[in-house]
């Protein structure tokens, strides 16, 4: 059970806690996964800076804003209310949206790594509230809640970390220059805000990713001859 929760919701400690959570130095192995992006390079779907920005923005709009981000908001609220049934429901729902073995494996392994880290930091919640196979989103929501991060900031932080990871993949595998990556960040910062706004406004019946291309790329990645990343 966590014992060192900050007392000021949304204060400096919360901000620093969020920065820790979204840091690429967080030892959970997120750098090893590309979420199908490496396959998009291999298949010739994404070949340059402009196409990469278009791909990332599409995944943000049709994926994160419809799935990960709204679920993150729901899960953080459920953690705040110690609502184990709702936590279990959305954790299971999230697993069901992972359309390939690699995407499912990524979510489960990152969730397991984050659980281990939180345990080492004495930040785990009541064991009875943790699902048997907690996904990454589920425990990210808890880690933000225990730090008293406001929900909107949690979503923005998660989206930022996801964007940085996608660009890190591109810098290694496309390859993309670091200055080009910064141009994409400048271009897509408003899209992160827009995706967060959309996620917070979505009703339950509006949830679910619409990413057939990403799912196909992820499936093909399983048999890709030469790979740098695990998804």
From Swiss-Prot:
Location within or outside the cell: Cytoplasm
Instruction: Enumerate the InterPro entries for this protein.
Output: UreF (IPR002639), UreF_sf (IPR038277)
UniProt GO cellular component terms: cytoplasm
ATP-binding as UniProt keyword: no
Q: Which cysteines are joined by disulfide bonds?
A: none
Which keywords fit this entry according to its UniProt record? Answer: Chaperone, Cytoplasm, Nickel insertion
> Is Transmembrane among the key words of this record?
no
One example of the protein's molecular function in GO is: nickel cation binding
Q: How does it assemble?
A: UreD, UreF and UreG form a complex that acts as a GTP-hydrolysis-dependent molecular chaperone, activating the urease apoprotein by helping to assemble the nickel containing metallocenter of UreC. The UreE protein probably delivers the nickel.
Spell out the PANTHER family in the cross-references.
UREASE ACCESSORY PROTEIN F
Could you tell me what this protein does?
Required for maturation of urease via the functional incorporation of the urease nickel metallocenter.
Q: Which family does it belong to?
A: Belongs to the UreF family.
Question: What protein name applies here?
Answer: Urease accessory protein UreF
